[in-house]
């Protein structure tokens, strides 16, 4: 994925992990020895898929609901505009990842409250089947399809 991230942006890059990084530009940053880091322009250009893809779509923004943004064979990503309490009943077939992209929320499970703020990410094991989300936040919910 080619990306440039500026101040104030939140990017959720949901993908399979990879040990490969190609740098197209690195703002002349230096490594620990004071050398500029290696660029990989030719390799990066060879790896880019240049086909135009029209994937823009509007999605629902129902309060306290899991609104599907991406649903593909590998994973599902939902947007939750949380404004109070949302009870969650997990199928137990996949872990769930929550990313707080705005505001703050609490996750209540088995009488224990865990608190999360903007920028926090939490991995919920598949065995945690019933819990509550409370607060005022914008949350991404990701799980394996």
Each model region followed by its residue ranges:
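A generic structural signal for well-ordered coil/turn residues at beta-strand boundaries
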Residues: 8, 71-76, 94, 118, ...
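Ligand-binding loop in jelly-roll beta-barrel domains
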Residues: 2-20, 126-145
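Short acidic-glycine-tyrosine-enriched beta hairpin
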Residues: 1, 109-128
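Glycine- and acidic-residue-biased ligand/ion/polar-headgroup-sensing regions
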Residues: 8, 82-110
């Amino acid at each position: 994925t080619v990306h440039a991230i500026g101040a104030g942006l939140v990017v959720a890059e949901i993908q399979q992990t990879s040990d490969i990084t190609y740098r197209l530009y690195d703002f002349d940053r230096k490594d620990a020895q004071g050398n500029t880091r290696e660029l990989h322009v030719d390799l990066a250009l060879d790896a880019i898929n240049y086909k135009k893809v029209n994937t823009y779509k509007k999605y629902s923004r129902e309060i306290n609901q899991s609104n599907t943004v991406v649903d593909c064979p590998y994973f599902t990503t939902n947007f939750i505009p949380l404004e109070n309490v949302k009870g969650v009943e997990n199928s137990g077939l996949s872990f769930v990842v929550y990313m707080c992209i705005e505001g703050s929320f609490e996750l209540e499970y088995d009488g224990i409250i865990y608190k999360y703020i903007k920028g926090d990410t939490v991995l919920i094991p598949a065995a945690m089947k019933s819990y509550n989300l409370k607060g005022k936040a914008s949350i991404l919910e990701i799980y394996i399809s």
